[in-house]
Amino acid sequence: MTDAGLRRLKIHIACCYNETYSKDNLPEWLTTDYLPYLKDEELDDISVDKMTLEDREAWTDNNIAKLLEIADKEIISSVAEKPISLLASVLEIKDALEQEEYITYLPIPIDGSNNGWQHLCAMSKDKEAGELVGIVPQDIQKDFYVQCAKDLIKRVPDWFEERQMPMKHIRKGIAKRGSMTRAYSAGAQKIAENMYLDCHVEGYLDKYNITEEDCELLAKHLIKAIDKVCAGPLQTMKFLQKIAEAEIASEYSKNIKQKSIRWTTPSGFPVIYEAFVENEFKEKAIISCSKRKVKPILTKEDGSKEETDTIRIQHVGKEPTDKPKIRSFMSGISPNFVHSMDASHMARVIAKWDGDFGAVHDSFSVHACDVDELLDLIKEEFITMYSYSNFFEVIERMIVTNPDNFNYNQPRLGSLDIREVKNSDYFFA
């Protein structure tokens, strides 16, 4: 176990436990003054995973006795955010501290900070949005969901004033999922459904008197808030939709009977995107039960029950046609393209990585002593992918089959220098 590996293990342990501190009771060992940050974000407390990397490491150092006790007694901690991962990690650090030479086998995960928005920011060179998703270096990691929540509150102040929801509950129940999925073109209806479900899971429906109608209202305003916070990325999504329109819905595309959108990702993966109109059909069938000793029981509309000799089945199915479904192309091009770029980034990283590697969606994992090396490679490949003066031209070359058929003006580029990500602690963390 190297010193760098031990540091990364300590950071991981701190995030697995993830203790929360009130702004009025911040510990003395902190190396950073979080009060201005908490005031600006309108938060009353801070969890360890929102602190600097130095303070995450310091948390483990200052709680080592408690952590070693968890290891000695093999405790599944009820107060830890990730109790199983915590136990595995403290068993690891116990052996590492006690043995002069120690080989670690535990995978240490590093997670992307809003990957979809990261790619959209890089395409549009949106520096302001890049500051919120870990592309631009920050002393303290900014919270993208809080920024969206703050703008949302300004749009419907009376609603939030009436309920007196603390920011951390607004972030978790109202803003988080919608802000995350909007990068993949989630609409107001889906955002409202997810918002209602999240509030139900967290117990906010009764606590703050939140209805489905409230979520429908908030979802519409949340989309406007996201548009304000992430202007560049949202324009990029609209640009991709215009390309889809030209490729599938234009007179030119209809004349040549174009039925798919195709591109090749930076990793060399060929994408064929298809979506077809489906015709609905119905089939009816009757199953005879006359020879069964125990007859099926049917419940009538009035609630009464009776035995039956037959069961009637009605199946509704869908069969695809060869007609392109324009609406699906329009709504799906942005998430499919962004996901393909995200997958391409991971593929390029894996292709150059010469060691053990694990991945779950946007979470990469390697052994503790290799984390810093992996982070360098992740940043290097991201920079390489987006080191173009105008990535909108790259997108057109990737997707547009006939430049004469596409005359939509490209969105205005921001001032982001993609090389800034090299010095960011929170691009993946």
What spans do the regions from the language model cover?
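Conserved catalytic core of nucleotide polymerization and phosphodiester-bond processing enzymes
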Residues: 1-429
